[in-house]
Amino acid sequence: MSESHLSNVWFSVTPLEVASGHGCWVTTTGGEEYLDFAAGIAVNSTGHAHPKVAKAIADQAQRFIHAQVNVFKHDLLEPLAAKLADLSPGAIDTFFYANSGAEITEAAVKLAKQATKRPHVVVFSGSFHGRTHLTMAMTTSKTSYRAGHAPLPAGIFVAPYPSPLAEDQDVEVARALQGFDHLLKSMTAPDETAAVILEPVLGEGGYIPAPPAFIHGLVERCRAHGILFIADEVQSGFGRTGTMFAVEHYGLEPDIICMAKGIASGFPFAALGTRRELDDKWTKGSHGGTYGGNAMGCAAALATIEIMSDPAFLANVNARGEQLQAGIRELQREHDVITQVRGLGLMVGTEFSDAARVAAIQKHCLEEGRLILMNAGTYGTCLRWMPPLVVNEAEIDLALAAFAAALKATA
C-alpha cells in the first residue's frame, strides 16, 4: 500500500494492510490470516464484522445516517440510554453521547467542574485519558503522549498509583493513599478539587487492576470531601474484565462513568453516564458536538448490548480469561523473564523484566505465529492481551502456542 498521502504521525505496531476481518481473525490484502489479539486496542468487543452489528449498521444506513441532536432527536437515542441505565452501576440513569474516549473524558471533566464549581482534577501515575490538550495533561503513562505540546492545561494534579510489583501490597496501598492525602494538603485543597478520575484497571499504564483497598480508600475520601469520583471505563468497560464494567468487581458506584471503545464493537461511539441530579447542574448548551449520539453509532451500540446481554457472553469472557492466565502462568514457570501475570477477564497483562524481550516476542508472534499483540506500560515491559471477547478456547490455545514458541526463540 502506498502511504505517500497519509500523515506520518501515526505509529504502527504492524506493517499489515487488512482487507477483511471476521471474529478474532483478519485477512490481509495478500490473503494471509492473522489472529488479532489487539482487537483495535480493545475496541472490537464482539469481534470483526459481527453479523448482528453489521446488519444493524446497514439497516440504519437505509433509514438515515446522521441526525444532529441539536436539530432534532432521532428514535434510537432514548432506547440506547434506557439500555445503558439498566447496565450501569448504581443510580446512574442519564447519558451524554460523543465519538471517542478522549471526548467523553473531557466531557466528564467539564461536567464535574460545572457541578461542583471547583477548578481542579486529580489523576494518577500511569494513567491514559486521551490525546486532546486537556486529556494529554491528564495522561501520565508515557512522555511520548505529551512531548512537544506544552504548555498543557493547568489544574491537573497527579497522585501515586500503587505498584503491582511491590512485595507488600498493604504497605504500597497505604503509601499511595498517603500520597493522595498529601496532594490534598499541599497542592489542591478539597474545596478546589472537582473530581478524581481513575481507570479501575490501568490501560496504557500496564493493565494493572486497582487494589480493592486503594480504590475504596479513594472513594471514601471523595465522599468525605464532596469530590466527584469519575470511573474511566473507556478500555475496561463493556465486558472486557468479565463484568459489564470493572467497578462492579469492587462494588462501587461512580458519580460519572466514561464509556467508549467496546460500546459499539468498533464503530466510533462514546457515552458519559451520571445521575440526573448531577446532569441537571450542567448548563444547557455548554457542551455538545456535531456527531455525538449519531444514529449509526447508536444502532451499533444497541446491537452490541443485545449480544452481550446473553449470559453466555460474559461467561465466555471469564472462562477464556482464566484459561489465558493459567496458560501464561504455566509458561512463567519455565521462563523467569516473566515477572508477573495480572488482569481481570480478557484484560490481561504479562510483565517482563526487559522491554527489548517484549519487543522481540511481539515481532516473533507476528512474523512466525501470525498473532498480533501489543505492549503497554511506561517502560514497555508489559505485553497485553486484549482479544475480541468472542474468542474461543481453541483460539486461546493457538495464541498461547505462538507465545510459547516466541519465548523459546527469543531466549
Where are the language model's segments positioned?
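Conserved N-terminal phosphate-binding loop of PLP-dependent enzymes in the Aspartate aminotransferase
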Residues: 1-411
